Swiss-Prot record:
Location(s), subcellular: Cell inner membrane
The species this protein was found in: Campylobacter jejuni subsp. jejuni serotype O:6 (strain 81116 / NCTC 11828)
Name listed for the protein in its UniProt record: Lipoprotein signal peptidase
Domain of life where this protein originates: Bacteria
Entry keyword annotation includes Ligase: no
Pathway annotation: Protein modification; lipoprotein biosynthesis (signal peptide cleavage)
Gene: lspA
Family: Belongs to the peptidase A8 family.
Length: 156
């Protein structure tokens, strides 16, 4: 595989993997999968907002804002290829998760959430896509920190 197209393979591989995994877990949740434990429950919630149900007052208009943000990020990444090459897996994960949640908004009227972490405190209910978005942001930050350290080491 040509080195110049390797990042595209990584991007789309991560995108598809995250999208399929998230939709699969959501389909199990919608089919009635439930589980309770001392720390974590698998349940069902439909989030019509974004994180912590913010912006839920936008109702069905939120899906169009969500769509616009994803389209803008796609365009920016494919225009700014250096950023995409550097963080292809992380952005693939992030956009796969974002598109999966967007699909939920169009099909279900909100995002299907299922994980409820409640040991010591009640945390917001979240889904696989939410976890992948957080992991992708952490990956980008870690890569940037190490890139800066390498650059600083070369300057010394």
């Amino acid at each position: 595989m040509a080195k110049t197209f390797k990042f595209i393979f990584y991007f789309w591989g991560a995108f598809v993997l995250v999208f399929v995994l998230d939709q699969w877990v959501k389909s199990l949740t919608l089919a009635g999968l439930r589980w309770q434990s001392e720390y974590l429950d698998l349940t069902y919630a439909l989030n019509t907002g974004v994180a912590f149900s913010m912006l839920s007052f936008l109702e069905h208009n939120l899906k169009y804002l969500h769509l616009a943000l994803i389209v803008v990020l796609f365009i920016y990444l494919f225009w700014q290829k250096t950023l995409l090459k550097t963080h292809s897996i992380a952005f693939g994960m992030m956009l796969g998760a974002g598109v999966s949640n967007l699909l939920d908004r169009f099909i279900h009227g909100g995002v299907v959430d299922m994980f409820f972490w409640h040991k010591w405190f009640n945390f917001a209910i979240f889904n696989v896509a939410d976890v992948m978005i957080n992991i992708s942001v952490a990956l980008i930050l870690i890569q940037e920190i190490f890139k800066k350290r390498k650059k600083d080491d070369r300057m010394d």
